[in-house]
Amino acid sequence: VHWSAEEKQL
């Protein structure tokens, strides 16, 4: 899956 940069902080 691919997520937004903000969710990559998790």
From Swiss-Prot:
Which domain of life does this protein belong to? Eukaryota
- Keywords for this protein: Heme, Iron, Metal-binding, Oxygen transport, Transport
Decide whether keyword Methyltransferase is in the record.
no
Asked if the Swiss-Prot or TrEMBL record annotates the protein with the keyword Iron, the reply is yes
The protein's GO terms of the molecular function aspect are:
metal ion binding; oxygen carrier activity
The record's function comment reads: Involved in oxygen transport from the lung to the various peripheral tissues.
Self-association and partners: Heterotetramer of two alpha chains and two beta chains.
Q: What is this protein called?
A: Hemoglobin subunit beta-2
Q: Please name the taxonomic classification of the source.
A: Eukaryota, Metazoa, Chordata, Craniata, Vertebrata
